[in-house]
């Protein structure tokens, strides 16, 4: 005969009745993390947002939040956090990290190109020869003309048109 249990008496050895207790603070921390994830998603461009695996409800909520200002945006971020609680945030976070890392790599490349341009204008032919050994596809004559023009503009205190053109040329030829 089965043993009767009172209402307050729980058999903790029974696996079916095992309950995992989560503290209220942990729930709040998780909720805040999801709201921050939602805020990061709102800051993305539409092209980058398409690269993130989101369902239609979440995409619509994010698009709406992008058009809101201040208090409405804050409420919408809370709503996005609520929607994220019902989904697995790991694939979304991984895709977001990939998008952000790609952006950081692009920024680092642009900074490197700026340094190369500065070296070309300041050091002249020695820097140009070094650059051409690394990137033989570059047009030597065109680069020399741009470098000379940038140096003359700097001496005459004119706007740096050739200086910018060197950067654009390097960006199109090296970055791609």
From Swiss-Prot:
GO molecular function, one term: ribosome binding
GO cellular component: cytosol
Keywords, sorted A to Z: Cytoplasm, Ribosome biogenesis, RNA-binding, rRNA-binding
Disulfide bonds listed in the record: none
Keyword presence, rRNA-binding: yes
Domain of life: Bacteria
Endpoints of the signal sequence: none
SUPFAM superfamilies in the cross-refs: PSPTO4464-like (SSF158710)
Compartment(s) of residence: Cytoplasm
Pfam families recorded: DarP (PF04751)
GO biological process: assembly of large subunit precursor of preribosome
Record has Methyltransferase as a keyword: no
PANTHER family per the UniProt record, alphabetical: UPF0307 PROTEIN YJGA
Cited function: Member of a network of 50S ribosomal subunit biogenesis factors which assembles along the 30S-50S interface, preventing incorrect 23S rRNA structures from forming. Promotes peptidyl transferase center (PTC) maturation.
UniProt record similarity statement: Belongs to the DarP family.
Protein name from the UniProt record: Dual-action ribosomal maturation protein DarP
Organism this protein belongs to: Actinobacillus pleuropneumoniae serotype 5b (strain L20)
């Amino acid at each position: 005969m089965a043993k009767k249990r009172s209402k307050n008496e729980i058999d903790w050895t029974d696996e079916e009745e095992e309950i995992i207790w989560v503290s209220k603070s942990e729930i709040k921390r998780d909720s805040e993390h999801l709201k921050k994830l939602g805020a990061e998603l709102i800051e993305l461009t539409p092209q980058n947002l398409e690269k993130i695996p989101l369902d239609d409800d979440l995409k619509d909520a994010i698009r709406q939040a992008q058009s809101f200002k201040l208090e409405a945006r804050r409420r919408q971020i809370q709503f996005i956090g609520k929607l994220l609680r019902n989904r697995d945030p790991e694939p979304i976070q991984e895709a977001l990290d990939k998008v952000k890392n790609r952006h950081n790599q692009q920024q680092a490349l642009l900074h490197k190109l700026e340094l190369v341009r500065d070296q070309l204008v300041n050091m002249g032919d020695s820097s140009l020869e070094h650059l051409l050994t690394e990137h033989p596809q570059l047009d030597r004559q065109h680069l020399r003309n741009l470098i000379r023009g940038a140096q003359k503009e700097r001496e005459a205190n004119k706007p740096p048109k050739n200086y910018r053109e060197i950067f654009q040329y390097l960006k199109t030829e090296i970055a791609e």
